[in-house]
Amino acid sequence: MSKRILAAVVTVLSLTAFSPAFAATTSTHVLLTTSAGNIELALDDQKAPVSVKNFVDYVNSGFYNGTIFHRVIPGFMVQGGGFSSDMKQKATNPPVKNEADNGLRNLRGTISMARTSEKDSATSQFFINVADNAFLDHGQRDFGYAVFGKVVKGMEVADKISQVQTENVGPYQNVPSKPIVIQSAKIIKK
């Protein structure tokens, strides 16, 4: 009898140990080295695979190196990943599917895909929420903005960026008066 119980316990434990629900969550980590300091991101490979792959492809190609945070709004977010320091927009890969319905929320410290008013228009640009922004979540007012990770180190840097003096540059508003440059973006953990 005790051998059967032991066998049953071993079987149940082995099934749950190898179940995806019990698997250790892995996330890709990216280090953004900026002129304002470093920001480390943990990307949610499981809930936002399309957005994470898109972001990682841009990181691996060196696309973000030399781009700026071109739109910063205190108490809201800091946006970057699409413009050079002279406010020239960089050519991007095709847009990706919007994953805003993945259950992740636009909370302080999360990173999301920026897009136009078109649902599936996100390319390279992203933003870091410096406040809880529930109105950007799926279904609040439209499809929403896809969260695909979070800041795990350097949130004080994002906060500092959000407080810099801004100005209008041509048609663009909320542009830092002194460029905040992403000097490099690289994968540090997979």
UniProtKB/Swiss-Prot annotation:
Residues 1-23 form the signal peptide. Residues 26-187 form the PPIase cyclophilin-type domain. GO terms for biological process: protein folding. It comes from the Bacteria. It is an enzyme of class 5 (isomerase). It catalyses: [protein]-peptidylproline (omega=180) = [protein]-peptidylproline (omega=0). NCBIfam families: PRK10903.1. PPIases accelerate the folding of proteins. It catalyzes the cis-trans isomerization of proline imidic peptide bonds in oligopeptides. This is Peptidyl-prolyl cis-trans isomerase A. The lineage of its organism: Bacteria, Pseudomonadati, Pseudomonadota, Gammaproteobacteria, Enterobacterales. The gene is rotA.
